[in-house]
C-alpha cells in the first residue's frame, strides 16, 4: 500500500452502460487538458459489445469478430473484449504528482483486484509473464494502461456477470486458448452493484487516497476547451 496522498483527492464517476468510442475520447480529452491542479479521477463503466486492439495488437489474434466491432486503442497490450456485465475502471492519475512509478501503479491495480476478489471469497493471483489477474489458469481481469505527460489513463476490465462467448472469437490478450472466467461463475448471484464499492475501496486503499468523492458524469464536460460553450465546465475538475 502506498503512502497516503494527503493533499490530493480522487473523484469517482459512474457512467453506467456506454458505447466505447465517446468514453475513450472523453478520457483522452481529460488527460490532454488536465492541469497540475486537476483532481485524479476513476470512472466505472460498462461498455456495449466491442473488441479493442492494444498498441501491440496483431490482426491474427482477432479470429472471427462477427457483428462485434473492432476498435484500435492506444493502451498497452493486445486484443480484448468489453461488454455488459464487465466492470471497466478507467484510472486517470497524475503519476508525477503522486510520485508513483508505472510498475507501482500496475502492481496496485492487480492488488486492488486480488483484494476485491478475496473479499468475495475468491482466491486469485497476478502472473509475472502475463499482466492481469487469474483464478488458477483462467483470466478474470485484464489491464492495459497508457501514460501521457506523466498521467495514466485506460485501466482494468473485471469480468463480473457477463456473456463470455465473445472471448472465444479472439486470442485474449494475444494468448491462443486463454480461458476466461468471471465472478458470477465462482460466486453465484454476485452483481455489479456488489462489486463496485469493494473495487473502489480497495483501489483507494492501495494508493493511499482518502475515500473517493463521487461526482456526476456528463460527456459534455469532457469536450476540448475550444469546443465547449460558455455554459460548459472545462475539463479540469
UniProtKB/Swiss-Prot annotation:
**Site positions for Lowers pKa of active site Cys:** 139
- Spell out the molecular function terms from Gene Ontology: lipoyl(octanoyl) transferase activity
Q: Which family does it belong to?
A: Belongs to the LipB family.
Which PROSITE patterns does this entry report, sorted A to Z?
BPL_LPL_CATALYTIC, LIPB
Where substrate is bound, by residue?
A: 75-82, 142-144, 155-157
What name does this protein carry? Octanoyltransferase
Q: Which HAMAP family match?
A: LipB
In the UniProt record, the gene name given for this protein reads lipB
What is the organism field in this record? Answer: Yersinia enterocolitica serotype O:8 / biotype 1B (strain NCTC 13174 / 8081)
Enzyme nomenclature, EC number: 2.3.1.181
SUPFAM superfamilies named among the record's database cross-references: Class II aaRS and biotin synthetases
What residue ranges are annotated as transmembrane?
Answer: none
Amino acid at each position: 500500500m502506498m503512502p497516503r496522498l494527503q493533499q490530493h483527492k480522487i473523484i469517482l464517476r459512474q457512467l453506467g452502460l456506454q458505447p466505447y468510442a465517446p468514453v475513450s475520447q472523453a478520457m483522452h480529452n481529460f488527460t490532454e487538458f488536465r492541469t497540475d491542479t486537476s483532481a485524479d479521477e476513476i470512472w466505472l463503466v460498462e461498455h456495449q459489445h466491442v473488441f479493442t486492439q492494444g498498441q501491440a495488437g496483431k490482426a491474427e489474434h482477432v479470429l472471427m469478430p462477427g457483428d462485434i466491432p473492432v476498435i484500435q486503442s492506444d493502451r498497452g497490450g493486445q486484443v480484448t473484449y468489453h461488454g455488459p456485465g464487465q466492470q471497466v475502471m478507467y484510472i486517470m492519475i497524475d503519476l508525477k504528482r503522486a510520485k508513483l512509478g508505472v510498475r507501482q501503479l500496475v502492481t496496485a491495480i492487480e492488488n486492488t483486484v486480488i483484494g476485491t476478489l478475496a473479499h468475495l471469497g475468491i482466491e486469485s493471483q497476478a502472473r509475472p509473464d502475463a499482466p492481469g489477474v487469474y483464478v488458477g489458469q483462467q483470466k478474470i481481469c485484464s489491464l492495459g494502461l497508457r501514460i501521457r505527460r506523466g498521467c495514466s489513463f485506460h485501466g482494468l476490465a473485471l469480468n463480473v456477470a457477463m456473456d463470455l462467448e465473445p472471448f472465444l472469437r479472439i486470442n485474449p490478450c494475444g494468448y491462443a486458448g486463454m480461458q476466461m472466467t468471471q465472478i458470477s461463475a465462482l460466486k453465484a448471484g454476485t452483481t455489479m452493484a456488489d462489486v463496485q464499492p469493494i473495487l473502489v475501496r480497495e483501489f483507494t486503499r492501495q494508493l493511499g487516497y482518502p475515500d473517493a468523492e463521487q461526482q456526476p458524469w456528463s460527456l459534455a464536460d469532457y469536450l476540448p476547451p475550444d469546443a465547449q460553450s460558455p455554459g460548459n465546465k472545462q475539463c479540469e475538475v
